[in-house]
Amino acid sequence: MNPAETLLAQTLAANAAAGYPDIDRSAAARGERARHQAYLARKHRIEGLPAPPADSLEARLVRHHIDGDISAAQLIAITRLLPR
């Protein structure tokens, strides 16, 4: 398992155990995060960047963020560990 996968697993477990501290998991918050991610996806398409494969770690990170499993700060920290 690479460092990003390891940190994601640890973060998911810690957030679940702590009751998702400081993460708004309401339907409205999920909708807002989904709208923001859709905006970023459109922006990336315009810039010519390919969408990540649906089963990739990057795509799973976005889904976990939208669902409120990880915070924006945690998303960024894990994304920085992705291989380039």
What kind of feature is each model-predicted range?
Residues N2-D67, S71-R84:
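Acidic, Ser/Pro/Thr-rich low-complexity regulatory regions
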